[in-house]
Amino acid sequence: MVLATNSDSDEHLHSTFASRYVRAVVPRFKMPDHCMPKDAAYQVINDELMLDGNPRLNLASFVTTWMEPECDKLIMDSVNKNYVDMDEYPVTTELQNRCVNMIANLFHAPVGEDEAAIGCGTVGSSEAIMLAGLAFKRKWQHRRKAQGLPIDKPNIVTGANVQVCWEKFARYFEVELKEVKLSEDYYVMDPAKAVEMVDENTICVAAILGSTLTGEFEDVKQLNDLLAEKNAETGWETPIHVDAASGGFIAPFLYPDLEWDFRLPWVKSINVSGHKYGLVYAGVGWVVWRTKDDLPEELVFHINYLGADQPTFTLNFSKGSSQIIAQYYQFIRLGFEGYKNIMENCMDNARRLREGIEMTGKFNIVSKDIGVPLVAFSLKDSSKHTVFEIAESLRKFGWIIPAYTMPADAQHIAVLRVVIREDFSRGLADRLITHIIQVLKEIEGLPSRIAHLAAAAAVSGDDEEVKVKTAKMSLEDITKYWKRLVEHKRNIVC
C-alpha cells in the first residue's frame, strides 16, 4: 500500500551511465511505453539503490544479512519454485516437514519417534502469530459453545512491549488486546500482573522470548506456574503462546536449562523467525504446536489444486521455496554445535560492545545479560543532547542504529539499540565504540544545545532551578523535537 505523495517535481528518472544504451527518460510513476536494453534497466535501478543503507551496518534489524555462497547458490537455484505446488515439488515439501520436526524437537515438543510434529513454515513470525492466534481463538470458541456461553468478547493478554504484529492480530481478528504496562527498570511483562488480567474470555497469554526493546526473556516458567494455579481454581484452561521470534534460536543453545518451551504444560504453541537467529535471509518463519489437538482441524484446508491433496494452514498461498531450502541447509550444515558456536560468538561481541559503551561513562545499559545478543542503552544526562541526535550523527559513518522511547508508563526513557548478528565482528564493535565517542564529543558543543541552556538560564537565575528546568526540557521538549526532526529517517523497532 503506497501512502506517499509525489514529492519530486521531476516525474522522470534520468539515466547516468545507462545513457550509453538509451537517451529516453523513464517515467517514475507510470509504466514506460517502450522497452529498454537489459543493461540500461539494470544500471538505472542500481544507481538508485546506491542511496540505500548498507545491510551489514543496519544494526536496527534482527534479520540475517549474510549467508554462505553455497547457500546463496541453492537459493538462486530454487528461486523459481512455487512452494504450494507440493505435488510438483515433493522434495521441497519434505524439507519443510523435516525443518518443522527439527524445531519441534529443539523446543521439546512431546513427539514420539514415529510421530510427525505439528507446524508449518510461514513468511515470518507475523504470519506465524496470526495462525497461532486463530487456533487459540477457535479452541476458546469451541469450549465456550460447549458450555453454552457467549463467544463475542475474546481477549488476549500481552505485555506492552510486544511487537506490532500482536496489535494487528487483535485488530484484524476482533480480539481485545489487554496489555500489561511496563515500568522503569522493568521493561517486560510481569507474569503476576498478566495472570491477574486473565478472565474467562482470555484465549491465551502471550509471552515474549526476546523483547524487541531490550532483548530480555520474559519469565515463561513463572507465568506457567501462576496460570496453572488460576486454571485449577477457575477451570478456564487458559493457554500460553511463546513468541520466540528472536530468542527461539538463542535459548536452546546458550541457556539449555531455561524452561520456556513445551517442557511447560500450558505452553501450547511457539513461533520463531528463521530469518533472524535461524540465520536465513528475510522471508521465513515457523510455528509449531504442542500436539495435534492444539490445532483445530477445521482451520486446515485440504486443497486438490494440481493433482494431489494439499493440507495447508496459512494466510498466504503462492510463495517461494528458496528460504525453506536455505533453512534446511543451515540446520544440516551447522548442526547443534555450529549454532551454539555462532550464538556464543554473538554474545561475546555483545559483551564487548556493552563494556565499551559503559567505559564512556555517558550511558546506562538497559538490556540484560541474559537474553538476545543486543545492547540497549540510554543517556545518563539528556540535558545536552539526546539519543535521537546521536543516532542521526552516527549515520555519517554508515551506522543505522534506532533510537526510540519505551512504551506507555516508561515512555520518558529513550534508548539506542544495537543488534548483534553473526556478521557483526569484534572489530566492528570496536569501530562503533570509537564513532560513538567521537559523536559525543562533537555534539556536546553544538550551538543548538548551548542556545537551549542559555534559554533555560534566562528563565531563572537560580542555578539549581536551571538544572531542574534543563532536565525537564530535555525529557519533554528536546526529545519531542529530535523525534520529529529524524522521524523520516528513523527505523521501525523490529
Swiss-Prot record:
<dbReference type="GO" id="GO:0030170">
    <property type="term" value="F:pyridoxal phosphate binding"/>
</dbReference>
<comment type="function">
    <text>Catalyzes the production of GABA. The calmodulin-binding is calcium-dependent and it is proposed that this may, directly or indirectly, form a calcium regulated control of GABA biosynthesis.</text>
</comment>
<keyword id="KW-0112">Calmodulin-binding</keyword>
<dbReference type="GO" id="GO:0009506">
    <property type="term" value="C:plasmodesma"/>
</dbReference>
<feature type="modified residue" description="N6-(pyridoxal phosphate)lysine">
    <location>
        <position position="276"/>
    </location>
</feature>
<keyword id="KW-0210">Decarboxylase</keyword>
<comment type="similarity">
    <text>Belongs to the group II decarboxylase family.</text>
</comment>
<dbReference type="Pfam" id="PF00282">
    <property type="entry name" value="Pyridoxal_deC"/>
</dbReference>
<dbReference type="GO" id="GO:0006536">
    <property type="term" value="P:glutamate metabolic process"/>
</dbReference>
<dbReference type="InterPro" id="IPR002129">
    <property type="entry name" value="PyrdxlP-dep_de-COase"/>
</dbReference>
<keyword id="KW-0663">Pyridoxal phosphate</keyword>
<comment type="subunit">
    <text>Homohexamer. Interacts with calmodulin.</text>
</comment>
<dbReference type="InterPro" id="IPR015421">
    <property type="entry name" value="PyrdxlP-dep_Trfase_major"/>
</dbReference>
<dbReference type="GO" id="GO:0005516">
    <property type="term" value="F:calmodulin binding"/>
</dbReference>
<dbReference type="InterPro" id="IPR015424">
    <property type="entry name" value="PyrdxlP-dep_Trfase"/>
</dbReference>
<dbReference type="InterPro" id="IPR010107">
    <property type="entry name" value="Glutamate_decarboxylase"/>
</dbReference>
<protein>
    <recommendedName>
        <fullName>Glutamate decarboxylase 5</fullName>
        <ecNumber>4.1.1.15</ecNumber>
    </recommendedName>
</protein>
<keyword id="KW-0456">Lyase</keyword>
<dbReference type="GO" id="GO:0004351">
    <property type="term" value="F:glutamate decarboxylase activity"/>
</dbReference>
